[in-house]
Amino acid sequence: MRRLLYTALFLCALGVAPKARAQYYTWGSDPTGLKWSTIRTPDVRMIYPDTVSGVARRTLFYIRTVQPDISYGFRHGPMRIPFVMHPENFQSNGLVMYLPKRVEFLTSPAIDGYSMPWYKQLVAHEYRHAVQYNNLNRGVIRALSYILGQQGSTIGLLCMPIWAMEGDAVMSETAMSSFGRGLQPSFSMGYRAMGRVGRDYKGRRDRRNIDKWFCGSYRDYIPDHYELGYQICSYAYARYDENVWDRVAWFGSRNPYMLATTRIALEKYYGTNVRELFRETFDALERHWDSLPRTGYSAAPLVAMPEGNYTTYQWPLPLSDTTVLVLKTDYDRPSRFVRLDTRTGAEEPVCYTGLVSTRPAMYGGRVWWTEYRRSKLFEQRVNSQLCYMDLERGTARTFVGRRNALYPTPAPGELAWVEYNPVSYTHLRAHETSAH
């Protein structure tokens, strides 16, 4: 009788309990048809669908290769952490997160990547975050983790700014490659085009609005925190001949109650602060860029744009001597194709698009492009759908059955495109277009 009473009380408690969650932050679910496997080693655990077992083993090889050097500059190595692989998402990315702790890889290679293999880049970048997390999970933060679990460890992430974490990780992937992201001309092109970063229009230091370079802006174009962090971190390493974030992490994890631990640690150990590092970094970059040989500037805008216009026009396709078709994106409406008169700047909307994945191409009055399409059921199934539009009709249509397409290239009577398979094979496809 007593056992029955306890059972009834337990069931009642379950009935009134709030909804339980297994984790706080998730990237979403994978398709249910995938069968999962695991590879266990003393340091990492690979969790992957059977369809990408080769990718998982290759990634494990990269992890083992970088392990001796991935913690360079920090006093503690990477934490023991599982790697979870998602093969059916074309929006390539990586993530390191607590609650629960794991590294997640979207294994489809980046569309705008470079010569460094995608899995190697992910390992060199995301595994460096595992080093940062382990160095932040010390002292008081570690004590909190015994009481609060991984919620306590998450507090340590407040002791190191996000731009510093990402900049240090970009330094890691750059150092572990022959031509990494930090060495790409496009990676610093935004700052170089601006000229006087952190100064007003008269060339004076802009003391009022320096925060926008760290927080972003809806009015002005500001490069992201990856680019900012890499420039500051690489300058700090060159100036002080050590990784300054090791001491920042060490101090912050032991004194989280001080709140502004980054500022205090930089002043205590290096006699500087974030504002000074920012100014010194871009002063040094400006001197370097000014010392380079001058080259002729042959580019000219198609049409004069209004001042303060925060709009992007991409991939112009000529329609006539005075008209081009461009993809327009801004903060007001979804991306769309517009006809642009190069003489007057007048625009005529043609059709709206989704999130475009690869550049459009045109032949015979028909425009082809690809755009990301997310599954309505599974967040981790994101395809690259082949689409087209006849200029006479101005209606976007879907090329049925082509969901893994990239870089469509039309020709007389035919269409070719690159097709990526989640199993990690890339093919070149061709199709007759007379029926469409």
Placement of each model-derived feature along the sequence:
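Acidic/His/Gly-enriched intrinsically disordered linker/tail segments
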Residues: 31, 117-122, 130, 135-234, ...
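Beta/coil-rich, acidic/histidine-enriched accessory regions frequently appended to metallopeptidases
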Residues: 26-29, 35-38, 220-223, 248-250, ...
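Sec-dependent N-terminal signal peptides
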Residues: 4-13
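Conserved beta-propeller blade repeats
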Residues: 95, 113, 120-121, 160-162, ...
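Conserved small/polar residues in nucleotide/adenosyl-binding loops
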Residues: 426-433
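Short, solvent-exposed loop/turn segments at conserved positions within beta-propeller repeat blades
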Residues: 330-334, 377-383, 421-425
